[in-house]
């Protein structure tokens, strides 16, 4: 019986990882920004659980984008993400796709060079089915680089202590 359960779990796991947005889901906020790609950072596992480092999925490969302008922001729920201010950073995980996110996002980021400008739209959903959790799928498209690029914020947090919403 246990072998059957593990076999079924192994067959279903890839479907869950690259799945569409779970339903029902409530849209809490939408944030569209023009940003400049800076770099990709490897963030190792911090070894905080018994599953670490082999089976925990804590390690991240983060693409870092600096926000230039905020084109569109709409908060439809009480707990939606805040508006991204010019000079702030947006991180996109390159190792794991969010549910509802196109697989082309990682392909496009892999082609980017530091200084390339993109339009990033982050939709903040809250899944309200049997399990309740946030989902933030990202869409990215190339745009022309704007002339006025704000400097980096001085109070940017250190990369190794910044929490990720996952």
Whereabouts are the PLM-identified features?
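N-terminal low-complexity, Pro/Thr/Ser-rich intrinsically disordered segments
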Residues: 21-38, 42, 149-166
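Hydrophobic h-region of N-terminal signal peptides that target proteins for export
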Residues: 5-19
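Structural detector for short beta-strands of small beta-barrel domains
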Residues: 27-76
